[in-house]
């Protein structure tokens, strides 16, 4: 969930809908590097966290560093990790969404910044559960110029899990593509990092039951610890939710 404002009424119904569909974890963005504040929508964020906890869900908060201002990125990441809701709830984990390339155009400098950010993030939050949301290996196979030498292995010591953005619909909107890319991205990310992998799927607006079924089966077969589609607002078809609930089994 990221497309909301600071009115709790804009996000609480989304959380309720997720819970009603059987989702066990809510993923929600805390802010962006261009936002005016470290927590962009604190009222809505707190309301979403409280609603999710009331419904027995886990909640992961994420922030996308741009690496052009290291202190800002670290400060905003820590603000998300330390955030406490009006009812005293805290997030279960934090996701560093490491994909933005325009903040530091030079590949080598950006890679060094991503590693430094990850190291300092862990140093500042030694007991937090941290995940790295990353460009999937198959994406860099077909577009290596996006981020040459993406530092999967170098970042691995600082994270508990990796979450590749396995958006197979950018390559093909069919079950075979969903199956192939999902399995390859789980296996390759595990090989590169040595860490558990939670494979993200999508884009939800372009998928059907067959694609999602293939995605779920491939993810489970390859050893992913979980999964879900990006994003909730565009996950419209009931039959898609039926397939996604297989992750809960």
Predicted features along the sequence, with ranges:
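Aromatic- and acid-rich polysaccharide-binding/catalytic face
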Residues: 28, 91-104, 147-179, 230-235
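Substrate-binding cleft of secreted/luminal carbohydrate-active enzymes
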Residues: 159-175, 188, 195-249
